[in-house]
């Protein structure tokens, strides 16, 4: 099997297997050599990032956004090393909130990809990654949705559900006192009944 020759890096690969080729193509040196090759090619044609879209026209503008190699030459976009960047999965072509796809947009002074007009927000607010709730509405404690909505937004204050052991113990002591009072009242009523019965005899 013949060795694989990389035209961008001008080398023969020692490992010519598909896995070796893939590893080479994803390597840093190969990517930088590929970028340098296309930059030299564009420079020879007299194409710069500033006039790049003017050479291509409307169709070329859309193709340039779809082609990652061409997208790297546009100002404001990340280069090919963005695979080492933690924000590599972020869609960079829509960074500008005023960005629009329209015919004839290459004639607009704000049409360059990644260009931010003065006074606009370069990075729009991202509500999904904020720790705040969007509408800042507090949840009720115990929302009981009924026509007679008497329980809405009232905090729970039942002492028997508190985790405080002292309160629980006090409640039990109160219950014991109540039980003993009931018992003594029962005894007194029983004795009074016996006393009445003895007098009747």
Curated annotation (Swiss-Prot):
Gene3D superfamilies: Classic Zinc Finger. One of its GO terms (molecular function) is mRNA binding. PROSITE patterns: ZF_MATRIN. A zinc finger (Matrin-type) spans 4-36. GO terms for cellular component: commitment complex; U1 snRNP; U2-type prespliceosome. It is found in: Nucleus. It comes from the Eukaryota. Its main location: nucleus. Residues 137-154 have a biased composition (Low complexity). One of its GO terms (biological process) is mRNA 5'-splice site recognition. Belongs to the U1 small nuclear ribonucleoprotein C family. Component of the spliceosomal U1 snRNP, which is essential for recognition of the pre-mRNA 5' splice-site and the subsequent assembly of the spliceosome. U1-C is directly involved in initial 5' splice-site recognition for both constitutive and regulated alternative splicing. The interaction with the 5' splice-site seems to precede base-pairing between the pre-mRNA and the U1 snRNA. Stimulates commitment or early (E) complex formation by stabilizing the base pairing of the 5' end of the U1 snRNA and the 5' splice-site region. This is U1 small nuclear ribonucleoprotein C. It comes from Plasmodium yoelii yoelii.
């Amino acid at each position: 099997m013949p060795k694989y020759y990389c035209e961008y890096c001008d080398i023969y690969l020692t490992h010519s297997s598909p896995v070796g080729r893939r590893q080479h193509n994803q390597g840093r040196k190969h990517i930088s050599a590929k970028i340098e090759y296309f930059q030299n090619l564009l420079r020879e044609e007299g194409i710069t990032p500033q006039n790049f879209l003017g050479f291509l026209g409307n169709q070329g503008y859309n193709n340039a956004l779809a082609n990652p190699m061409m997208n790297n030459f546009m100002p404001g976009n990340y280069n090919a090393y963005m695979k080492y960047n933690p924000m590599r999965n972020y869609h960079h072509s829509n960074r500008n909130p005023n960005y629009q796809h329209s015919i004839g947009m290459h004639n607009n002074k704000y049409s360059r990809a990644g260009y931010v007009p003065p006074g606009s927000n370069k990075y729009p607010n991202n509500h999904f990654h904020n720790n705040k709730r969007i509408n800042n509405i507090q949840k009720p404690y115990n929302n009981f949705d009924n026509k007679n909505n008497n329980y809405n937004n009232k905090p729970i204050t039942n002492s028997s559900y508190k985790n405080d052991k002292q309160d629980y113990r006090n409640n039990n002591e109160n219950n014991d006192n109540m039980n003993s009072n009931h018992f003594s009242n029962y005894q007194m009523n029983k004795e009074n009944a016996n006393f009445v019965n003895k007098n009747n005899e």
